[in-house]
Regions:
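Conserved "landmark" site that anchors the functional core of diverse proteins
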Residues: 1-156
C-alpha cells in the first residue's frame, strides 16, 4: 500500500513502542504517547500490535491513496473522512487507488493513530522507527512526514 501526503497536518510522525532499555545511555524511550490506542489501531488492520503507525498531533494530514489497502483511526477528537464522507470510528476502512483520506480534528482531542495495513519500509535506530528529536534535529529523517512524502508498505503474507 502507498499513501502520499497532500498535507501533513501540524505534526504527523512515525511512532511505535519506542526504544526501551537505552535511557542509561541518554536515549529517551519515546514512541507513541498512547500505546493502547496504537496497539488497537494495528489490531484493527491486522498488523503486529507493535508495528509503526502515524501519530497525528492536533491537526491531521490529507492523504492520497496510490494503492489499495486498509486503514484504521483510533483516538478521540478526530474524524476520518474518505472522499469527503465521514467514516465510522474504530473500524478498519478499505481504500482504493485515487481515494482521499483526511484526518480532521474536532477540537476535542490532541492525538490520534492511523494504522495502515502492511509491513512498513522504515529506517530504524535501536530497534525503533519512532521519530526522535534531539534539540532541533530529527534523528531519523523521514519519521516526520511532510507534503509530498510517500508512505510505502508491503503486503503481509500469512
Amino acid at each position: 500500500m502507498k499513501l502520499q501526503f497532500v498535507t501533513s497536518g501540524l505534526r504527523t510522525t512515525t511512532q511505535d513502542l519506542g526504544r526501551p532499555g537505552h535511557t542509561h545511555m541518554g536515549v529517551p524511550t519515546g514512541g507513541a504517547l498512547d500505546r493502547s490506542a496504537m496497539r488497537y489501531a494495528n489490531h484493527l488492520v491486522g498488523n503486529a500490535l507493535a508495528a509503526p503507525v502515524l501519530e497525528v498531533t492536533l491537526s491531521g494530514p490529507h492523504l492520497h491513496c496510490l494503492e489499495a489497502g486498509r486503514v484504521a483511526l483510533v483516538g478521540s477528537g478526530f474524524d476520518l473522512l474518505l472522499n469527503g464522507e465521514p467514516q465510522p470510528p474504530l473500524l478498519p476502512i478499505s481504500v482504493n487507488p485515487g481515494d482521499e483520506l483526511i484526518i480532521k480534528s474536532s477540537g476535542n482531542g490532541c492525538r490520534a493513530y492511523l494504522s495502515v495495513s502492511g509491513q512498513w519500509h522504515a529506517e530504524r535506530w535501536l530497534g525503533s522507527a519512532s521519530a526522535l528529536r534531539i534539540g532541533s534535529h530529527e534523528l531519523l529523517p523521514g519519521a516526520v512526514w511532510t507534503r509530498g512524502d510517500v508512505l510505502e508498505l508491503s503486503l503481509i503474507h500469512i
